[in-house]
Amino acid sequence: MKLYYTTFKSPVGEILATRTENVLNFITFPKSTWQRFFSALKKDENIDLKKDEKKFSSLKKTFKPYFAGKKVKFKESLDLTGGTPFQKRVWKTMLKIPYGQTKSYGWLARQVGGKNKARAVGYACGANPIPIVIPCHRVIREDGGLGGYGGGLSIKRKLLKIEGAKI
């Protein structure tokens, strides 16, 4: 399988993104996570990894105004095949959280049919393969606390501040 990647600078650090010919399938930051990612890919002989800036031009054009604090709509097709059915429901529901707003883990659990599954929702957020585009940073604790974030709470806070969310 051909897998394309790019890297680019952002206010939250350098971002690594991957895609197949048709779909965006992975975003990671900060840069300290890249080594683990590349090591895992090298073990899979079926993956042909190639850097290709052109395949990400639309994504980069969308990120630029996003990081400038403008509301944008990411238009990439997303590959969610790596998730469980529950995770996919959580990720698709997160896509509906409006820019600049936050929702609680409990709210998200109720939306996906499990009012007592806030912890499971938190794990699904942590397993999100395409952060920012799938806005897991908009999910916070019921008491208004930030909760967790794979990129670290300072990055979560920064993303919410960029969006003008009240935290």
Predicted features by range, described:
Residues 94, 121-127:
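Major-groove recognition helix of helix-turn-helix-like DNA-binding domains
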Residues 114, 118-121:
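Helix-turn-helix DNA-binding helix
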Residues 132-139:
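Short Lys/Arg-enriched helix C-cap and helix-to-coil transition segments
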Residues 142-167:
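…primarily DNA-binding HTH/wHTH and HhH modules…
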Residues 1-114, 162, 166-167:
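Basic nucleic-acid-binding alpha-helical/helix-turn surface characteristic of O6-alkylguanine DNA
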